[in-house]
């Protein structure tokens, strides 16, 4: 199977037109006519990721975050983006990113988070349609049984493997309905609060968004990387279901640049 056929399978699931206007999802580096030798699946592309792909015999890297966000005027290796590109090109490695198109796709990033949390009746917060394809930013789901706020925080720590959750004052009412936005979700908080949803889970939140939300909605911020860590599982499921015989590996390299001490 050619690399371009694997890309086509991934982009059937998360079509590029679903990405936000500011995004740069899609093919980042390389030529796609070669036979695919393997795919390395990751959240971010770093030099260590390119090295891992080469070590595992993969000539395709599928990332969530695009390697290239800003316009390039030269290719000299002066920053990590350029070094990753040069290293990948030298080794014949193609880089593909599925970013906000995967966030906005049905069954995408936010659906996977909801699945990990055990939510049911999962749906887009505000569904849209493009060429017969339903999509949207953020999802809403519910627990089969309501949780006390402190138990909700414990659940998040367990599911996402975090030692702490950034939150506002704990709700005194049970939590049943939950809105989710992987990555940075400040832009959806008002929609969730106005809809009467009990809790909002995201990876990042602007400081001033916390004010005035006491006992209105439970804000729970788990970290950008942590909120999207399961995205590679979606990539793997698509490839295994649509690209028979293609080897794929979830990267061993942790690319989270944020550390806590």
Regions found by a protein language model. Give the residues of each.
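Hydrophobic structural segments
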Residues: 1-261
